[in-house]
């Protein structure tokens, strides 16, 4: 039997997913069922745009519910670690110096489900995170970028 992949989540990410699931199941699912019933009352369903739209929304909601349930059935919380021996791990906030543009960037290393570049949350599977994982402050690493490799130096790690 194939081993199921564990989804890495922070405690905050777990709470967000649980809240989203409750909203979808308790509120949005009921709302869309009501919309479908109202559209059915309009008569002929073959050319009923409201019905088609409500069914498409229902499909999206059910797909997301299934996706979240799968995540919640196969997750692992990112554990707190000994802060004396600071190394880059999943869950850490890391400030790096990018030598290609001489700028500093701060990222939080998270699991793929929580990654959101707009919030500076990058997946531990991303090229930057892969390059700096398990390194200490002051150490450098080569990131295998899309266009070319580049060097970064770890300035600060907050666990």
UniProtKB/Swiss-Prot annotation:
GO terms for biological process: DNA-templated transcription elongation; regulation of DNA-templated transcription elongation. It comes from the Bacteria. One of its GO terms (molecular function) is DNA binding. It holds the Pfam family GreA_GreB_N. Keywords: DNA-binding, Transcription, Transcription regulation. InterPro entries: GreA/GreB_C_sf (IPR036953), TF_GreA/GreB_CS (IPR018151), Tscrpt_elong_fac_GreA (IPR006359), Tscrpt_elong_fac_GreA/B (IPR028624), Tscrpt_elong_fac_GreA/B_C (IPR001437), Tscrpt_elong_fac_GreA/B_fam (IPR023459), Tscrpt_elong_fac_GreA/B_N (IPR022691), Tscrpt_elong_fac_GreA/B_N_sf (IPR036805). SUPFAM superfamilies: FKBP-like (SSF54534), GreA transcript cleavage protein, N-terminal domain (SSF46557). Necessary for efficient RNA polymerase transcription elongation past template-encoded arresting sites. The arresting sites in DNA have the property of trapping a certain fraction of elongating RNA polymerases that pass through, resulting in locked ternary complexes. Cleavage of the nascent transcript by cleavage factors such as GreA or GreB allows the resumption of elongation from the new 3'terminus. GreA releases sequences of 2 to 3 nucleotides. This is Transcription elongation factor GreA. It comes from Mycoplasmoides gallisepticum (strain R(low / passage 15 / clone 2)).
